Amino acid sequence: LNKEARHMGGHPYDGHTEIFATLTGTKTYAMMFYGPLKIMHVSTHCSLREACNRATKQRVLDVIRLLNQAMIQTGMEHPHLAVAGLNPHAGEHGLFGDEEIREIGPAIEEAKMEGIDVDGPIPPDSVFGKTLNGVYDAAVAMYHDQGHIAAKLQFMSQCVNCTIGLPIIRTSVDHGTAFDIAGKGIADGTNMKQAMLVAEEFMKNR
């Protein structure tokens, strides 16, 4: 799905996630990377300035709930989750920003009271490495590039884009349309195959 072409055609949606949410009347949903590193995003296609505004207690709590639900749907009975901070060093007790104190921390505490096994806020520069090494089963990223860079650095062909919270199963490849190689017979279908396999995995445990 080419974002530029879609906007040129007058369509307001930022991506698949927003389109399917509108079509299904879904209010609470999130984008998730599913692969060797499993990451769900608090915000996606918006400016970094706007991403900071969207890191509210309610939104972070909603995403923690959705991630917990998604992991259970894939057969994990008691997922152990991590939540990244928004600021360097997760704010360092308010020295580098107070979103962790005002919004993210309270969301985590409420999730814990609901019985969700979740830790954080954890400094963004270490949380994804810990998740990859098995300390956590999945992680919440605060914004698009925070999660995308971590996932794509090693696992570009294995990352599948999922929308969690919809009444349907939705997965897709995690790369663009690549118009520059269209018709040349050199496209790699590995990621498409992986997207189908992940959809099957969600379906088995639905």
Located regions from the model:
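Anion-binding alpha/beta catalytic cores of soluble intermediary-metabolism enzymes, centered on
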Residues: L1-E99, G105-R206
